Amino acid sequence: KTLGISTAASPAKPILDKSGYKKGDSTIGVLSLKELLLTAKTLGINKYGMDKNKSFGTGTLNAVNYLLDKWGYQKNGIAGENFIKRLHTEIENKVK
């Protein structure tokens, strides 16, 4: 008897992006992503800061995973096209 407690595993959260920028990447695109993340921090959307450079490090990873979790997705550390579009929409909605 389970006493009303479900023993079924909770369904896995969906994945927002399977490919995109990830920890260890170092490109001008990562710099652009980080500028969006820092703007989001200024607006109170994201709580993590990071260095202003083109390297995807721990600070960027923390910010990406924080937002993925906040939006109901798996924290897989990947910021792809869907992540960037969603982040832009969040920023746009804050500044309207």
What is the predicted function of each stretch?
Residues D17-T89:
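Short acidic, glycine/serine/threonine-rich helix-capping segments at coil-helix boundaries
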